[in-house]
Amino acid sequence: MTTAEAVDLVIWGPYFTKINKIIGETAGVVRGENFALGIQSLNIKTLGGYPWNESDRMPEFDIFRQGNDQNMHPETDGSVLYRIEAAKPTGQGSSLQAYCRNRFKERIVEDFDHDRLIAPAYDDGGVTGSKIAIFGCPVDLSLETIGMIELTEGLPHPLIDGKWAKTSAQANAAYLITAFTEETVDHAIALTKKAGLKYLYHYGKTFENWGHFDLYKGEFPNGIEGLKKCVEKAEAQGIKMGTHCLSNFISPNDPYVTPIPDLRLAKVGSSVITGDLDATATEIPIESPDFFNQMKNNHLKTVMIGDELIRYSSVSKETPWRLMDCQRGAFGTFVSQHKAGTIISKLLDHGYKVFLTEADLTIEMSRKLAELYNETGLRQISFDGLEGNRSTGLGTYGESLMPYTWFNELSADLKDHLIIDASRTTHFFWHIYTRMNWGEPWYAGFRESQTEYRFNNQAYFKRNFMPGMLGWFRMTSETTIEDIEWMLAKSAGYEAGYALVADMESIAQNGFSEKILQQIGDWEQLRLSNSFNDGQKLKMRNNSKEFSIQRVGEGSWNWSEVFSYKFVHTQKFRQPGEPLFSTFNLDNPCREQIMQFMITASNCDIHLVSLEIDNYKTIQLPVALKAGQILRYTGSVEVELYSSTGQLQETLPVDPKDFLLREGAHSIQFDCVFDKAEKESEVKFEVRLTGEIEVVRHNGS
């Protein structure tokens, strides 16, 4: 092409097909009963997708739910992991598409909740060199064919123990996330091993700043050498170590910001000042307010003029346009005088109170991060906030730019065993990353946090040849064995990994920690060895069902469904003589068995607990529960009283025969005396019954 500068776009396709059984929108592969067609971008500047948006940001929604394959801009449905890119459904089948944009000229786009945002000029050769691969093959060779294309075309092809990450059973291995220091790393390694896991992920304050990635002295006082020794200790015990990265987010304390701000900090746009500024001015006259008065995503309200950063509260409502109530020399920069006509730029920021990067600075930061990995031997990374790299003006191209540069700078040894995850992907980034994963399990209970989001995304992963992941789960001092096994069963059912976030203090405080860690290791062994059959996996994918395993010998476990009946007994105020008990109905689905149960005093104290089974057998439990305490019975000759954090506090003898239930329907009348109770006081009563037992053997045994 001799006049590449005159060509704005090269569009590959759309290539329409009649195939519609499985459409991998991100991977760019559509599959029918026997035959698959695919498209692959062969370099980073060739984007999977179509220029639906001038910003090169691909639509993010579940197009399969929407039902309208023509509307690429619907209202968001919360399915943020979905990206309509290289493949999409059509009314008659599907289409494959890719494109490349000429970026020699500055453009104005919409992004980051800004109606006007400068996309800087970027010289990557323009559309010259854009290329794709189109392939067709039997369905069962689809993934293998992509792997061959990667190797033939020199695309990223990361490995795990020498095997392509996309086909490695270890690609979605579970891992422990915890805070540790040079002093406490041995304990963190021991906990990882106790849980039967092989990956330990640092999640304290790893870095003093984001940008230069200087290690935090409070946790790594010996800097690079200190972290390297932590990695070596873990490696010696078969544990790989990784950490968290907020991608191109730059903290205000970073040398890219202070004391002299880097000119490559991302900008919303620029104007000029219309009058001289002395060192005391708190109002700044500007020629145009266009890039300064967009407040939807304006978290730091910072402008750059020369080497000075200035924060402002607002823009005047009328001419002459002024930035109001300015704080001079923000973030430790130097207050200076400025002449009329000097360029003033609004810096682009993020809700995490950080600045972002232009493309050249993204590349430099990526190399710094790769240098850290090469020097320390870290082998796992999570690129959190990759969407921040759209600050480059490159859209999804920018999202791939940081991990692509980072990966290319890594040593050959690291590339031989590497796990790369992120909370999002793009068509090209698919080649680099190992798996999708995401965090923020903080706002709800173990079973409620992002539940629908976790499970709905599994179909997206499967149709795009991605290892399944369920995201992060947070273990607290009050997490129960039942909660953990609920999650572990979903992990096994979906063949999906997860991250367990657990600080050392919570693990130490939780009285069930030993059992929890053992169960994690046992379930993970069985999952990674593909020991569960398809029928068991299907059952475990049911969100409303619970399952448990019990080790019965070397390499073998009893697996069964657990039928959990959860009831609430509330304090009642009635006429004298009127019953105050609650009646609960349940069904024992299989054999005669001893019922197991838990009684939790939610927000009150109780005593004189009684259970009347089937209107003839009354069992008095001579125990008093304080608010938060839990009475557990697991079928033995004792009932156990625990604190809210699982610390055993008392045991009482019982006769197991009293709790024997035949197969079929039953009723239980629950009663107690409330102490120190409010009007809304309640007691939680859960009965647990075991279904048919199946023996599961470790495939490696």
Would you name each region that the model predicts?
Residues 328-336, 340, 586-701:
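Intrinsically disordered, low-complexity segments enriched in serine, threonine, and glycine
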Residues 227-251, 264-271, 426, 490, ...:
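Carbohydrate-binding surfaces of carbohydrate-active enzymes
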Residues 247, 251-335:
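Autoprocessing Asn-cyclization modules and mimics
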Residues 139-160, 193-202, 226-269, 339-341, ...:
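Glycine-rich, aromatic-flanked loop segments that form ligand/cofactor-binding clefts
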Residues 252, 256-271, 347-364, 409-510:
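Glycan-recognition surfaces
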Residues 6-18, 292-307, 333-352:
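Extended Gly/Ser/Thr-rich low-complexity repeat segments
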Residues 169-170, 174-271, 347-370, 374-400:
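Aromatic-lined carbohydrate-binding/catalytic grooves of carbohydrate-active enzymes
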Residues 1-200, 233, 240-241, 379-380, ...:
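Carbohydrate-recognition beta-sandwich/jelly-roll modules
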